[in-house]
């Protein structure tokens, strides 16, 4: 895996202060090691000019961002999600998926609600010349992708996978949630896998989904 460094200009502490930063400097699909925790990358995603689908394994993080940004962002609330699968912190113990069987019920009403809300939100942002920001867990990314495709605007969005190191955790990587999520990302025009956690290069090389992806490191110290 070939790593490329992007030197952060001197005096910059947060991504939002970097005037020349944009996703256009990266290929459509790549790994971004921001290296410095708390550098404001997530905030840039939610305040920058791009239309962004921000994917996170942690519901609480998404809820906190929704509370901070209010109507400027749209938080996908899918009642059919299984908390044990999507709220994945690698420090938490692993649960047996058989212990949390999904509740089988008709999800058409939930889909219709999400379709209406996402359509309404994105249209209003467009009318106001504002970028759209959609917050979603790995589990519900497929729904967002499907709705935006039906609206004819999916290719107007960039997909950012925050804290993607959670996908690499041995046991969890084998779960259906992550495997399905990676399948849908493969069908997406953009996928930016972002983390500040040191990557295990040998491990990434073993995974078909990541071994051929360009790898970028933000250099804050040169």
Residue ranges and their predicted role:
Residues 61, 166-169, 199:
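Residues immediately C-terminal
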């Amino acid at each position: 895996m070939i790593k490329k460094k992007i030197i952060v200009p001197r005096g910059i502490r947060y991504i939002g202060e970097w005037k020349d930063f944009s996703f256009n400097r990266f290929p459509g699909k790549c790994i971004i090691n921001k290296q410095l925790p708390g550098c404001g990358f997530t905030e840039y995603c939610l305040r920058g000019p791009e239309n962004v689908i921000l994917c996170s394994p942690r519901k609480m993080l998404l809820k906190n961002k929704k509370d901070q940004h209010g109507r400027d962002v749209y938080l996908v609330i899918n009642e059919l999600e299984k908390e044990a699968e999507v709220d994945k912190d690698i420090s938490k113990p692993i649960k047996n998926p058989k212990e949390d069987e999904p509740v089988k019920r008709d999800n058409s009403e939930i889909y219709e609600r999400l379709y209406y809300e996402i359509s309404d939100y994105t249209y209003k942002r467009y009318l106001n010349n504002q970028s759209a920001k959609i917050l979603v867990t790995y589990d519900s990314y497929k729904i967002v992708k499907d709705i935006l495709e039906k609206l004819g605007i999916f290719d107007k969005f960039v997909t950012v996978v925050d804290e993607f190191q959670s996908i690499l955790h041995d046991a969890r990587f084998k779960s259906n949630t992550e495997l399905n999520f990676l399948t849908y990302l493969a069908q997406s025009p953009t996928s930016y896998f972002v983390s500040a956690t040191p990557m295990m290069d040998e491990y990434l090389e073993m995974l078909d989904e990541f071994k051929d992806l360009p790898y970028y490191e933000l250099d804050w110290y040169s």
